[in-house]
UniProtKB/Swiss-Prot annotation:
Gene: metK
Protein's organism: Dechloromonas aromatica (strain RCB)
Gene Ontology terms, MF aspect: ATP binding; magnesium ion binding; methionine adenosyltransferase activity
Top-level division of the source organism's lineage: Bacteria
Protein name stated in the entry: S-adenosylmethionine synthase
Subunit-level organization: Homotetramer; dimer of dimers.
Residues engaged in binding Mg(2+): 17
InterPro entries, per database record: ADOMET_SYNTHASE_CS, S-AdoMet_synt_C, S-AdoMet_synt_central, S-AdoMet_synt_N, S-AdoMet_synthetase, S-AdoMet_synthetase_sfam
Amino acid sequence: MSDYLFTSESVGEGHPDKVADQISDAILDAILAQDKHSRVAAETLCNTGLVVLAGEITTNANVDYIQVARDTIKRIGYDNTEYGIDYKGCAVLVAYDKQSPDIAQGVNAAYDDNLGQGAGDQGLMFGYACDETPSLMPLPIYLSHRMVERQAMLRKDGRLPWARPDAKSQVTIRYVDGKPHSIDTVVLSTQHSPDISLEDLREATIEQIIKPVLPKELIKGDIKYLVNPTGRFVVGGPQGDCGLTGRKIIVDTYGGAAPHGGGAFSGKDPSKVDRSAAYATRYVAKNIVAAGLASRCLVQVSYAIGVAEPTSIMVETYGTGKVSNETLTALVRKHFDLRPKGIVNMLDLLRPIYQKTAAYGHFGRDEPEFTWEATDRANLLKSDAGL
């Protein structure tokens, strides 16, 4: 019998790195709403009273980037100078260039393929699914997301008036024989106004944010609750730490339960396989698990810049597969078009759908825009595998 602990974390929408991610994706959406064939690599830095927008954008869209940034900061809840950044008074600097023509020539017309679009860069991407939750996500990251999501909901609807936008969560699960057995430790830190006592904050956080999220069947024995362990968290958000786009790539994916190729998502249009192929491999892995062909599935793809066909495709099922990994890889090649433009068409990615992805995870959420979460090819895979 194997017995081990595994931990994942998430951060709230007011975390400085997530503020940057959301601004980058809000700008991407504003551009795609006007010109869906734009090339966008929008990076954001946010600090006390300051937002810097930089990167490469080639578009026919006419977007007020400064207003988009301010609107995003307002929606998150930074609407008071006491919070260190406020949407009305912060400085916003814009420094976008156009996409390099050397990159564009390989993306616009792949040398190996008449589908017309090569990969925007080399790289490797992973997708993962497992049967630990109904959304086929690992349990620790799933619970971590739900906690910071609930913190934001209770903050915005007035039930926790002392709560401020920045927050972090972390969940440790005990696994027995590879399956979740019980919840061991929950860490939650939430920014707060200076006038609430630590005792009241901890009680409200445990009772109103944490406990409603925990699956009752996994509450066995005493759970260790660590709420605001430093004792005070008034200074937070971009004032507490400088935020940058793309620094929460494990939060964005599987919480460390699966490998990561290293490429961030936010601010990138779908010609960037860092984003689109990570979505596609999640779609593939989720359909394999939904089909009952494995209880855990990892899919890797890789690309060369300017080349449409993936340089490799791999499926790994960790001994849980009903058919061989080689058979599954062949099924993936047969039923999923993993060329960059094939992915865009398969998942309908040329839409302004990305700001919603930029907090609480890109995967495992039941949102109508998240086409990569559909399991519409599970029956096809199952029948073709002969099961």
